Regions:
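PRPP-associated nucleotide enzymes
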Residues: 1-193
Length: 193
């Protein structure tokens, strides 16, 4: 039951799916020249503030991955934590947090990756994944794919299987979706610019 309607009534028709995708797209706010000149920042904060949109994100990605075995949903710091929590609840699975270096206690595995102005390191607690567990990676936005690919390598280094990626937004001109798909990953993006 969702919003007083059985799921198959509310989401069973393409019209409702398109309306809700349109609602999400309309909530995304653009900030030109942020965080620096020449960058168009797509802010998903209004999407995450809207309860209807959060529920729809869960439904949308559930439909894309419902026939896929998932042990955990991994969120990439920080906005990926919101989507991974929504999906973890929807799939009744735990959530893993992929964080910037130095933010997790205990033994961690680290992965270096390139960013616009240099490089950074992300990490995951070593005991988070057992060999051959199936992990869905979630993040708010896919741009060049460097962060997402580094997250996949981190999970694979621990013996996990990356069964797919879920992104609210994909910036197709920056090539991240192409990169991940060429590496053999399943990529699902709700809104593609």
């Amino acid at each position: 039951m969702l919003f007083g309607c059985p799921r198959n009534v509310f989401y069973g028709h393409e019209k409702f799916m398109d309306m809700d995708k349109g609602r999400i797209q309309s909530l995304i706010k653009d900030y030109p020249d942020f965080p620096k000149q020449g960058i168009l920042f797509r802010d998903l904060t209004p999407v995450f503030r809207d309860g209807h949109s959060l529920a729809f994100l869960g439904e949308y990605f559930y439909e894309n991955f419902k026939n896929t075995h998932i042990d955990y949903v991994a969120g990439i710091e920080a906005r990926g934590f919101v989507l991974s929590t929504v999906l973890g609840l929807k799939f009744n699975r735990g959530v893993l947090m992929i964080r910037k270096a130095g933010k997790l206690p205990g033994n961690t595995v680290k992965q270096k990756y390139d960013i616009e102005y240099g490089n950074a390191i992300m990490e995951l607690q070593h005991e988070s994944i057992k060999k051959n567990e199936d992990i869905l990676i979630a993040d708010d936005l896919l741009a060049t794919g460097g962060t997402a690919f580094a997250a996949a390598k981190l999970i694979e280094e621990l013996g996990g299987n990356v069964i797919g990626f879920a992104f609210v937004v994909e910036l197709s001109a920056l090539g991240g979706g192409k990169l991940l798909r060429e590496k053999g990953y399943s990529v699902h993006s709700m809104v593609v610019y």
